[in-house]
Amino acid sequence: MKIFPAIDLRDGRAVRLTQGDYDKMTVYSAQPCGVARRFIRTGARNLHVVDLDGAKDGTPSMANLVEIEALVQQGHAFIEVGGGIRTEERIRQYLDLGVGRCILGTVAVENFAFVERMAQRYQEKIAVGVDARDGMVATHGWQKTSGEESFSFCRRLRDAGVRTVIYTDISRDGTLGGTNLEAYRKLTELEGLEIIASGGISSVKEIEALKDMGAGGAILGKAVYDGKLDLGMSLRAAGDMRDELDDKLPLF
């Protein structure tokens, strides 16, 4: 199972939100690349990067775009990016930069046919983020709730050719209170769809449980930033530790 340490960007800084609330934001670093290098030196192979400004407003932030480009250029990790990606032009821009996978969110609810076309055209380079609040899909950086039931929406995505869904239980995100294992147990029963778990993962036992049930990956955020969850132990539990650590990779 893959482990994705998360780097959420706002105004070019690495931050974390609590339950998707932009008024409950903690700034962890003004140097996102430094954060990424620490994760990579610990053994991470993958990074999950979100443009929070783009997710909220629908317009990708230039400051965040600069940081994403820098993250890609320093190499050493597969990078998936989400937040405000609502056009094919933006998808192409990120893929041309060297981003490994683009995550579509709000547009999947508002323009399902577009997501179906993009999934067929770009295949494994497209994932969809399904963010659930009380079982319903939330959009616009979690600021609005749609009329789509989250599990049935995941089935629709699979049937449309989407290969990977990143499923977040918003009520657990950033709370350090544990993730919704029961939801992931149901989701992993959907054949032909890779499920990446996100939101509230705060223990190695949860990572082991997700791996055992067949989840394709887990996104780690606040628990790692706050020191509650050891990234190295998490990588080893998932079987996703980098073979060789690059001790020469600068931290800053």
Where in the sequence are the language-model features?
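Structural preference for beta-strand elements that scaffold enzyme active sites
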Residues: K2-A6, N46, H76-E80, G100-I103, ...
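Conserved, mostly hydrophobic/aromatic
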Residues: D8, F39, L47, Y94, ...
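Conserved anion-binding
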Residues: V15, Q19-D23, R92, V99-D173, ...
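Glycine-rich, proline-tolerant flexible connector loops at the mouths of alpha/beta enzymes
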Residues: N46-N64, T106, Y167-G177
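Glycine/small-residue-rich loop that forms an oxyanion/phosphate-binding "nest" at active or ligand-binding sites
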Residues: D53, P60-Q120
